[in-house]
Regions:
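Hydrophobic beta-strand-centered segment that forms part of the acyl-chain substrate-binding groove
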Residues: 38-89
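Hydrophobic residues in beta-strands and at strand termini
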Residues: 9-13, 65, 113
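Short, electropositive, low-hydrophobicity segments enriched in small/polar residues
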Residues: 24, 47, 122
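A broad, structural micro-motif
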Residues: 22, 56-58, 104
Length: 144
């Protein structure tokens, strides 16, 4: 099993701008939407992790807009955790049109793990079971 997730999204009218295309800020929201799905699919849902004292804020995000999505388009949003160190992780995203396969946007986000008090957490030290799960999914036999 890889650390990947996917979801579909029907573009809503309120997500478009005056030109009738999806406003660029919505892609970042869609990244969060699929990232939440990804963590649920690998058994590490955000809600449960936060209840257990692990928060994973975004520390950087980028998006490259390729083509325009419009109202009523269905897009597929894919995410993959591409790097995990025990303290940080990086996610890569691709948004494409469901009907045509045309890529609409590609992006990345970087995250760390913190306590509810805002202190950096090493999952390897503080949550070894969660660390093992993520390490195996992302790094396989390589040690984080």
């Amino acid at each position: 099993m890889a650390a990947t997730g996917e979801c579909e999204h029907l573009v809503q009218y309120y997500e478009t701008d005056q030109m009738g295309v999806v406003h660029h800020s919505n892609y970042i929201r869609w990244f969060e939407e699929v990232r939440t799905v990804l963590f649920e699919e690998i058994g590490l849902g955000y809600k449960g992790m936060e209840e257990g004292g692990i928060i994973s804020p975004v520390v950087a995000v980028s998006a490259k807009y390729k083509t325009m999505a419009k109202y009523c388009d269905t897009v597929v949003i894919r995410a993959e955790i591409v790097k995990y160190t025990g303290v940080r992780f990086d996610v890569r995203y691709k948004v494409f049109d469901k009907a045509t396969g045309e890529v609409r946007c590609e992006g990345t986000s970087e995250h760390c793990f913190i306590s509810p008090e805002g202190k950096i957490i090493s999952l390897k030290r503080s949550y070894p079971e969660i660390h093992s799960r993520l390490d195996q999914l992302v790094n396989g036999d390589r040690e984080a």
